[in-house]
Amino acid sequence: MSNIVYLTVTGEQQGSISAGCGTSESTGNRWQSGHEDEIFTFSLLNNINNTGLGSQFHGITFCKLIDKSTPLFINSINNNEQLFMGFDFYRINRFGRLEKYYYIQLRGAFLSAIHHQIIE
């Protein structure tokens, strides 16, 4: 079973980019109660390696819906805005409920690319 990941984003200039992204107005029938101000992340790729000279962080790539944060992310990349990003990882516990078990926090992050892909 795959992980469930929610993203919260705050921009230095725009403020809360993820505010309202988990609502039915933003995502339609994909909204989840309790996650109204978070962005549902379909996939996440995190690459860190050690070459013997220290650790190197190669960024995080994530996939999300087109929602109300999409134009704000475009503004962010256009203005080279610093971002605070938090990725919350959830799993199903032994009682059948979601529990947060892992967190990745990025401070002073910048977007380097945005790709829109529509698959038929």
Residue ranges and their predicted role:
Residues 1-120:
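Glycine-rich, low-complexity intrinsically disordered segments
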